[in-house]
C-alpha cells in the first residue's frame, strides 16, 4: 500500500557527506549499516501520522480550551514534523535471509537523528530536501524554511516546558508544519518510486 516501491539509490551513498551531530554524543554515534535501499519509510510515517491525529483530536474537539493543552499540542505536532522528516529517508538494519531461507529480524531506522527540525532537515540528502520543499509548498501553500526555522526547537522546549522560563509558540505554524510535512513525505514516496 503506502511506501512499497523500491528505488535504486545505493545505500552507502547517503552517509558519505551526512553532517555529524553537534552535541557531545557525536563521537559515539555512527551511521548504521542499512540493508537494501534508503527511501521513504511507511512505518516511521505512520508513527508521525498518529502524533498528528492525537493533536488534531484536541484541536478539533468542540468546546476544548486550547490554552489548557498548549504543550501536548506542540509536542505532538512537533514530533509529527520530526518523524515525517525522518520517514523521508528510512531503511532497515539487519534483515536478509537465514541459510534456511527465513527472513531475519530487522530494525527500522532513519538516516536522520536528533530533535532539532532544522538539523534533521539539513541531514537529509539534497534531492530529498528539494523534493520535500516542493511537496510542502504544494500541500500547504507555504514556504517550508520560515516555519522550519521558527518551530525547529518546539519539541525540545515543550516536552519539558517546566524547565523553560517564558517563551511563546506559534500553534498555527507548528500545525501547518506538521500537516505539510506529513503530506509532503507521503507525496514524495508515491511520486518518486
Annotate each language-model stretch with its function:
Residues 56-69:
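Helix-loop segments that flank and shape redox-cofactor active sites
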Residues 3-52, 56, 95-193:
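Long, charged low-complexity segments
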Residues 43, 68-75, 169:
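A structural signal for alpha-helical segments
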Residues 49, 70-92:
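Short, hydrophobic, well-ordered secondary-structure elements
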Amino acid at each position: 500500500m503506502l511506501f512499497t516501491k523500491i528505488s535504486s539509490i545505493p545505500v552507502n551513498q547517503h552517509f558519505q557527506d551526512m553532517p555529524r551531530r553537534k552535541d557531545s554524543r557525536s563521537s559515539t554515534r555512527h551511521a548504521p549499516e542499512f540493508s537494501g535501499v534508503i527511501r521513504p519509510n511507511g512505518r516511521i510515517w505512520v508513527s508521525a501520522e498518529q502524533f498528528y491525529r492525537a493533536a488534531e483530536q484536541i484541536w478539533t474537539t468542540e468546546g476544548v480550551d486550547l490554552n489548557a493543552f498548549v504543550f501536548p499540542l506542540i509536542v505532538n505536532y512537533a514530533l509529527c514534523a520530526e518523524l515525517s522528516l525522518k520517514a523521508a529517508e528510512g531503511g532497515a538494519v539487519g534483515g536478509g535471509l537465514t541459510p534456511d531461507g527465513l527472513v531475519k529480524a530487522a530494525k527500522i531506522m532513519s538516516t536522520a537523528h536528533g530533535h532539532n527540525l532544522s538539523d534533521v532537515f539539513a541531514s537529509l540528502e539534497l534531492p530529498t530536501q528539494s523534493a520535500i520543499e516542493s511537496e510542502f509548498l504544494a500541500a500547504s501553500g507555504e514556504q517550508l524554511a520560515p516555519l522550519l526555522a521558527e518551530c525547529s526547537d518546539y519539541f525540545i522546549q515543550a516536552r519539558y516546558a517546566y524547565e523553560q522560563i517564558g517563551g511563546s509558540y506559534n500553534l498555527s505554524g507548528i500545525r501547518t508544519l506538521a500537516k505539510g510535512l506529513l503530506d509532503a513525505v507521503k507525496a514524495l514516496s508515491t511520486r518518486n518510486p
